[in-house]
């Protein structure tokens, strides 16, 4: 029987990651079966409710306003548009809808009120609702919880050390603080990262240390393979090899046994065989739909064919945590405080991010 731990060291995690592959897979698959049904995989749909125009400089992201990419910015979707997309996702087999907005942080006002109504609407469809909206305060987290939010996503992206090579417009500590604010409510935490950004194996282990030492550990950990987008500072990074993804999934499963490990961005470059190995290694959640915010993703019908081929079943909603109750806006205990929190603005610069900022296409 595996033991839940919150004191993993970087050295221990590197040693696990570098095990002979057959030993690594056997250990990960054995632990996976202790805590989860190996033939059940959660299907989530990621919906970009507000695209582009983000003031941040995340080196991997085509939604940053400072980079010249082919992304077309869109204003916040309406509640009815979101409801229609959620119903479509539900009919395709998704049990969770994750709404993403390209914001640095949530600001109190009409747009946030609209997002809260989206959360209420989707929760009433008996689907898990997740949001990724940037940094949030404790009061904003409580307002989301009252609306019926099931999960809040805020990825650490990478290790604290390598983070400074990826993003200069906010600090790693802001990520941790946002997760802490979510933990003051009944909302579950979704937090993971990206591999393939030029980081070392030590950095991958460092990210897993940061995640696994959170108490409690995140209920969901997305593992993304970088999708290099033209116009971003990471446009020339080489694609992640499937073996790296398998090792990362397996290592995550071993050190966080109860967590749902989500096979996220980068699946377009993975064969069915590669994805099957990831499921065997402990991945038990995917994002479905033709796009992940702005990057291509396998068609949901193709995913369902893969599920049938592998004998996998989509997970039903609220399997891990019971459905939250929706409190209507008029009955809410928490109101807008008009907060203007002082999130950090690190003073360092990242040369390749600066080079791409404001540079037009030839």
From Swiss-Prot:
Free-text comment on the cofactor: Binds 1 [4Fe-4S] cluster. The cluster is coordinated with 3 cysteines and an exchangeable S-adenosyl-L-methionine.
A family per Pfam: Radical_SAM
Enzyme Commission numbers on file: 2.8.1.6
SMART domains to which the protein is assigned, alphabetical: BATS, Elp3
Xref: InterPro entries: Aldolase_TIM (IPR013785), BATS_dom (IPR010722), Biotin_synth/BioAB (IPR002684), Biotin_synthase (IPR024177), Elp3/MiaA/NifB-like_rSAM (IPR006638), rSAM (IPR007197)
Any single GO BP term: biotin biosynthetic process
Disulphide bridges: none
Residues the record lists as binding [4Fe-4S] cluster: 54, 58, 61
Reaction catalysed by this enzyme: (4R,5S)-dethiobiotin + (sulfur carrier)-SH + 2 reduced [2Fe-2S]-[ferredoxin] + 2 S-adenosyl-L-methionine = (sulfur carrier)-H + biotin + 2 5'-deoxyadenosine + 2 L-methionine + 2 oxidized [2Fe-2S]-[ferredoxin]
Keyword Metal-binding tagged: yes
Residues bound to [2Fe-2S] cluster: 98, 130, 190, 262
Annotated pathway: Cofactor biosynthesis; biotin biosynthesis; biotin from 7,8-diaminononanoate: step 2/2
Region named Disordered: 317-362
Broad enzyme group: transferase
Tagged with keyword Cell wall biogenesis/degradation: no
Segments of skewed composition (Basic and acidic residues): 328-354
Keywords: 2Fe-2S, 4Fe-4S, Biotin biosynthesis, Iron, Iron-sulfur, Metal-binding, S-adenosyl-L-methionine, Transferase
Cofactors, names only: [4Fe-4S] cluster; [2Fe-2S] cluster
Ranges of residues in domain Radical SAM core: 39-267
Biological function: Catalyzes the conversion of dethiobiotin (DTB) to biotin by the insertion of a sulfur atom into dethiobiotin via a radical-based mechanism.
Family named by the database record: Belongs to the radical SAM superfamily. Biotin synthase family.
Subunit structure: Homodimer.
Name of protein: Biotin synthase
């Amino acid at each position: 029987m595996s033991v839940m731990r919150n004191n993993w060291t970087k050295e221990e995690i590197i040693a696990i990651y570098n095990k002979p592959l057959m030993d690594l897979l056997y250990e990960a698959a054995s632990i996976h079966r202790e805590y989860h049904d190996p033939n059940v995989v959660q299907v989530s749909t990621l919906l970009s409710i507000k695209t582009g125009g983000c003031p941040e400089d995340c080196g991997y992201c085509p939604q940053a306003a400072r980079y010249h990419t082919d992304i077309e910015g869109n204003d916040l979707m309406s509640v009815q548009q979101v409801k229609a997309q959620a119903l479509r996702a539900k009919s395709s087999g998704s049990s969770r809808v994750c709404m993403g907005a390209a914001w640095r942080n949530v600001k109190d006002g009409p747009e946030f009120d609209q997002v809260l109504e989206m959360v209420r609407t989707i929760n009433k469809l008996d689907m898990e609702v997740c949001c990724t909206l940037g940094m949030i305060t404790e009061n904003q987290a409580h307002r989301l919880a009252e609306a019926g939010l099931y999960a809040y996503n805020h990825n650490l992206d990478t290790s604290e050390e390598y983070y400074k090579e990826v993003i200069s417009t906010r600090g790693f500590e802001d990520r941790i603080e946002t997760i802490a604010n979510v933990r003051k409510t009944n909302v579950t935490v979704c937090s993971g990262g990206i591999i393939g950004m030029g980081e070392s194996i030590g950095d991958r282990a460092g990210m897993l240390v940061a995640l696994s030492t959170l108490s409690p550990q995140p209920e969901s950990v997305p593992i993304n393979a970088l999708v290099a987008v033209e116009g971003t500072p990471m446009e020339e990074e080489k694609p992640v090899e499937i073996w790296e993804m398998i090792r990362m999934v397996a290592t995550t499963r071993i050190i966080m046994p109860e967590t749902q490990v989500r096979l996220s961005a980068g699946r377009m470059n993975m064969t069915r065989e590669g994805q099957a190995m990831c499921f065997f290694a402990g991945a038990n959640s995917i994002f479905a739909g033709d796009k992940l915010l702005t990057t291509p993703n396998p068609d949901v019908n193709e995913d369902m064919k893969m599920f049938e081929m592998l004998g996998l079943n989509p997970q039903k909603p609220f399997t891990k945590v019971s459905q939250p109750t929706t409190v209507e806006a008029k009955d809410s205990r928490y109101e807008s405080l008009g907060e203007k929190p002082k999130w950090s603005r690190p003073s360092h610069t990242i040369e390749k991010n600066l080079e791409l900022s404001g540079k037009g296409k030839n």
